[in-house]
């Protein structure tokens, strides 16, 4: 396999407008496999010499050009995108008609599809793709790494909590992501304010991430803890002390922070507009509430805080079945479908 990056993934630091801060990832992104940057190679020649072209989405001119080249060269295309109707509906009127024509053009240039989950699979089916062309390749993280790293922090979790000013008996509600309107972090605060804790200790609220809503959130919840942007190596320790992760987003294609939290044995609450809900959430490990419904979120918080320990254990068991091994199975099935069992160049 040879990977061509449209942009240099190893740039030291870049400004992320969603986080509203500079981001520098601490996980190596190009180690251990054959890769090149687009600026250093010829895309036509790369595709011409490939047995199959695997694309991640079609959102840039480079990706769309790659589709055209593959069609011209007769190279089969495997498409793996995030699209789902929950997050990316076609819309109505002329705009919707134009979008459908555009999407149909993209899909007609693809030989098979690698679905990240059930909602993504439905997206393709609703647009006329045959089920025989769709292969499940779950949107996954390195579960083993997150589980191991989380477990390694177990002995110092009490000290970590106290260092944040959180008492040992306090439960922790966690949000991880960009502090932007689409993620709706503010409704967590509104839901907590509706709950009568009946003399019980109120959970601590921790926000990990940054963005345009930070000032507003600080005003709404001055007692909340804002940790700012945290890197991959830092997240397992935070998930480890959290009891419930909440992702209340509007139009969220998936939500990989849910995978991460589940691997670290955390109970989950998501809105019904979060794509992963269909595949990962059940009453055993979490709750799904109607997007924007503050009262429903409040009820979910009460339930999950009460049952967080049991739900966290089920979360970890559930996510172990949604990993890289399943991705490999799906990819092999797709390659067999293309009759390319002896693929050397992808």
Predicted regions and their residues:
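Aromatic "clamp/platform" in nucleotide-sugar-dependent glycosyltransferases that forms part
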Residues: 250
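Conserved acidic donor-binding segment of nucleotide-sugar-dependent glycosyltransferases
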Residues: 282-283, 287-294, 302-308
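Short alpha-helical donor nucleotide-sugar binding micro-motif in glycosyltransferases
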Residues: 229-230, 237-242
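Conserved donor-binding/catalytic core segment of Leloir-type glycosyltransferases
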Residues: 155, 161, 167-183, 189-193
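Donor nucleotide-sugar binding/catalytic pocket of nucleotide-sugar-dependent glycosyltransferases
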Residues: 5, 103, 108-158
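Nucleotide-sugar donor phosphate/pyrophosphate-binding loop at the beta->alpha transition
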Residues: 76-78, 85-109, 153
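A charged, aromatic-enriched C-terminal amphipathic alpha-helix characteristic of glycosyltransferases
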Residues: 309-340
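Short hydrophobic beta-strand element within catalytic cores of glycosyltransferases
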Residues: 267-271
């Amino acid at each position: 396999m040879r990977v061509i990056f449209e942009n240099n993934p190893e740039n030291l630091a870049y400004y992320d407008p969603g986080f509203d801060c500079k981001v520098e990832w601490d996980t190596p992104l190009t180690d251990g496999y054959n890769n090149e940057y687009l600026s250093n190679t010829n895309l036509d020649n790369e595709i011409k010499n490939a047995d199959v072209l695997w694309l991640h989405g079609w959102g840039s001119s480079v990706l769309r050009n790659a589709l055209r080249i593959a069609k011209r060269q007769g190279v089969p295309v495997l498409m793996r995108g995030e699209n789902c109707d929950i997050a990316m509906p076609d819309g109505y009127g002329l705009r919707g008609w134009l979008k459908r024509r555009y999407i149909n053009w993209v899909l007609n240039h693809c030989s098979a599809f690698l679905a990240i989950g059930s909602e993504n699979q439905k997206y393709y089916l609703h647009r006329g793709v045959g089920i025989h062309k769709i292969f499940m390749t779950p949107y996954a993280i390195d579960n083993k790494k997150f589980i191991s790293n989380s477990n390694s922090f177990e002995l110092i979790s009490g000290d970590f909590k106290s260092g944040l000013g959180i008492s040992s008996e306090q439960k922790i509600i966690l949000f991880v992501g960009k502090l932007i309107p689409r993620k709706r972090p503010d409704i967590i605060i509104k839901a907590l304010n509706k709950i009568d804790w009946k003399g019980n200790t109120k959970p601590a609220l921790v926000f990990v991430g940054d963005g345009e809503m930070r000032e507003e959130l600080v005003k709404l919840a001055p007692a909340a803890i804002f940790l700012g942007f945290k890197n991959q190596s830092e997240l397992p320790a935070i998930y480890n002390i959290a009891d419930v992760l909440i992702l209340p987003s509007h139009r969220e294609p998936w939500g990989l922070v849910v995978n991460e939290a589940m691997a670290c044995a955390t109970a989950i609450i998501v809105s019904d507009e979060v794509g992963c809900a269909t595949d990962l959430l059940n009453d055993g490990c979490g709750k799904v509430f109607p997007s924007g419904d503050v009262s429903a979120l409040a009820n979910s918080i009460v339930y999950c805080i009460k049952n967080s320990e049991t739900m966290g254990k089920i979360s970890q068991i559930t996510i172990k079945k949604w990993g890289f091994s399943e991705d490999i199975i799906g990819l092999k099935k797709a390659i067999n479908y293309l009759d390319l069992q002896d693929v050397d160049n992808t």
